[in-house]
Structure formats: structure tokens, C-alpha cells
Amino acid sequence: MGRKRKPLPFIENVTIEAVAAEGKCITRVDDQVIFVPFCVPGDVVDLQVVKKKHKYCEAKVVRFIKKSDVRQEPMCEHFGICGGCKWQNLPYEEQIKAKQKQVEYQLTRIGKIELPEFRPIMGSVKTQEYRNKIEFGCSNKRWFTAEELAQLPQKEDDTVSSLKERHAQNAIGFHITGAFDKIYPIKKCWLMDDLCNEIRNFVFEYADSHDYTFYDLREQHGLLRDMMIRNSNTGEWMLVFQFHYDEEGDEQRAQELMQQVADRFPQITSLMYVNNQKGNDTFNDLELSLFKGNDHIFELMEDLKFKVGPKSFYQTNTEQAYHLYCVAREFANLTGNELVYDLYTGTGTIANFVAHKAKKVIGIEYVPEAIEDAKVNSQVNQIENTLFYAGDMKDILTNDFIRQHGRPDVIITDPPRAGMHPDVINVILNAAPGRIVYVSCNPATQARDLQLMDDYYKVAAVQPVDMFPHTPHVENVVLLEKRCETEIKQKLKERKEREKAAAEAKAAKEAEKLALQAAQAEDLTAEELAAKK
């Protein structure tokens, strides 16, 4: 017989203390850290622990004893179910305070480096309908809440098969965390212009009422698989369908659906589709077909136009992206004489945005299609002082590359969430630019990278930027300035001393361990071992 698991604790009358990572809140009971979702600081609750680790617990609210004065009513009826917008119950001014603290905490505790006073976080101009892109999944397995399930007709034999039958309804919406094959249907999403809701709801109603098959993720069949909607500040709209052709006639049915959408929504200037037979919903490696209009839309930023295709990366909050790039340009402090390297350039938005203030800008990006867009964006805007290269950053950005193209005066880097590869950091340090502007979507990995560069660069300015209201995500821009030679020598000396002390401590610990093992082998008591020493 297996060992009985000890029941997880039920904790009463707990006050939620603060906002923590990933949209959860934090409290402490008997020096144990507890993470709780869907709370706000000041809530008094009863908790059921659902997961217990050595250093922390995770719990869910069983009962609200007193709701915090800070709490606000979420605007969205899907709050707490769809998986997005986890901070809708927290007023926006409290959200950005929490994000400011998050950046300060991560740079201080992880980076452990000297920091200047942080600038106040730059809040988003819009807190609703701020996104320019949303992707919706389509499924023949609708997710039901407990309340919705209770309202469904009950069967006498509530077997696994009958439960599956009850879930067998079509849906378009978002994937549910922990139930990857099910979709929760969305009636209204507040993240994008309401036309997005109209398009999605029309597609569902038409397809469902005309007996279109919706995709089954486990069985991998069903015609309607996924849809991505983009819009731009030029008023253009893009819709990309992912279909899964199973049988003869599916392609014709897909064409009929797209024609219905095109007739109903003349605002759509780019309507594209792809037959995706893969095991996942990404289409970056697939060739798309054009049904109507152009294969792209345009975004405007100052006097620049940026071409955005279905596979392009473009910041999803257009208005706030402009303010983010303005901060990066300000920190770069260009005079027109500088050679600038723009690392992880994407579609060349930052590179082209700063090009008029630089002598030359070289952009590097992993995705070849993004580099093609970057080149097109330079051509569209008649920018002639940019060069773009596609490939893995650590393979492209080498000391040989810098010898060939010139030592940069300024480096702007905007890496993915994982941060920069150590090889990339080493090449940057060898290149020794006067300034580095580090744009990050993950202050934790940014802090790690700043620590690796601390011997040679000091942090001169920090500007958090909120790109995603109602979520825990935050961007951060850091200006690094090269230290003088005296500072560098002192920093390197301090590092050597720390490494020496750490090595000595490790050696002493190892010697003590070996001595203990020898004593055990000789069967010496602690007193005899001490006397022998």
C-alpha cells in the first residue's frame, strides 16, 4: 500500500500583503510565503493550500472575509477564466506602482549592482483596446465553468464518456491553462478595438450554424483551426485563417467562409489563409495564400511607415511602443556621427526609428522574414544608412564581424525574454561602445545581464514602461555608460578578491568534508577529531 498523503492545510483569516510575480498576490503565514491568484492587497480571506513546496505554497481563495478597499470590479465578464488580464481587479494606478516595484526589486535583488534613482514608470496611454493583434483558437471542445456545467442537462450515468459529450460544443476564444485541448468562448474582449469582437463572433456564428467542423487538437482533424486579427493606426485590418483540410470540399468551404467575412467586413484590407497540417498552430514556416487585398498593413510612427505582414513581429501596443522607442532614442543620445548596432532588431523598427540621427545603423535578427521586412521598411522610408543581417545573434555578432563593419559607438539591444547569450555579452564588452541601451521585456534576465557587464559599464538611467495594462508584464529600458579605466581596474580587482574568497571558502568546506569522512572511517569521536586537528 502506498503512503497516505498528508492533507494540505486550510488557513483562516489571512490578510493579503502585496502583489507578486505572474499576477498573483503574496502573503506570509508562520514565515511561509504563500502565492494566491485573483486577490488584491488588503483582502482578508480563507485559503486552501493546493501546492506545497519547500520554500513556498500556492493557495486558492475559499472565502472572502473582507474585500480590500483597493479592489475594483473587473470590467470583463470573462475575468478569472480566460487566463489574460489578471490585474483587472486592481486599479490602474496600483498596477503601475506594482510594476515599478517589480523592476526595482529584480534589478536590485538579482542584479546586485549600483543603481541610480529610477524614473517613474511610464503608464500606458490606453488601458483598454490597446492591442493591435490577438490570436483566437477554434475547437470542438468548449470549456465550461463549474456554473455552466451545472446548468447543462444531467445524464444518469455521469461517466467519462458522457462528460466528454457535454464538452463537445464548438468554440472560438482562448486556450485554458491546464486544459490545452479546450477553448473558452469569448463574447467580448476589451484588449482590442470592438471590430475584433464583431469579426470573431460573426465567424463563429456563421461556421457553427453552417455545420463547419472545428478543430480537435487531440485527434487533429476539423476544418476551422485558428484565426489571427491585426489592426493598425492607419485604420487597416488583417485577418489570417488557419484551416485544416481533412476531406474533399474543405477548401471550397473555407473559400465560402472567407467570402462571407469579406462581404460583411469591408474594413478588412488583408485577408489571408493557410492549410496547416502540422501538430502546432505556428505558421511562420508555412506559405500563406492571399484571399483579398494586400499581404500586409502599415503602421505609422512619426513620419515613418512600417510594413507589417502576418509573420512580422511588431510591438502589440502601437501607441505605447512609440513612447518606448522615444526613450531608447533619448538614451542613445545620437548626434549624427555614430555607428549604431541594433541587436534583435526584429522588423527594424528601432533601427529605422533612430537612423536619421545616426551615421549608420546595423541591425541583426534571427528571423530571415523579419530582416526582409526591415529592409523593405528602410526602402519605404527612403532610409539609406541601414544594413541588416539575419542569423543567430551569437553566430553573427562576433569579433570578426565588428572588425569588418566597425566598432559601434552605441549598441541598442532588445533581446527576447531569455535575455542575451553570454557569448553575445562578451563580444559587446570587447566592442566597448560608449553607451548601451538595453530594452527588456523581462527585467529578471535584464538584471542578470547587467550584472555580467557591471565591471565595464555602470547603469546611468532606468525607465520602466507599461506596455500591457491589466497584466503583470512590464518593459524596462536601461542606459549603460562605459566606466573610466580607473573604475574598471577597481571593479576587476574587487571581482578577483570576491572570486578568491569564494574559492578559499569552497576549499575550506571541502577540506572539512574530507576530514569528517576520514574521521568516520577511523571511527573517531568529534572530541578526538578536534584534538587531532
Give residue spans per PLM region:
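Terminal RNA-binding accessory module
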Residues: 1-78, 387-388, 395
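Hydrophobic beta-strand signal
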Residues: 46-48, 135, 341
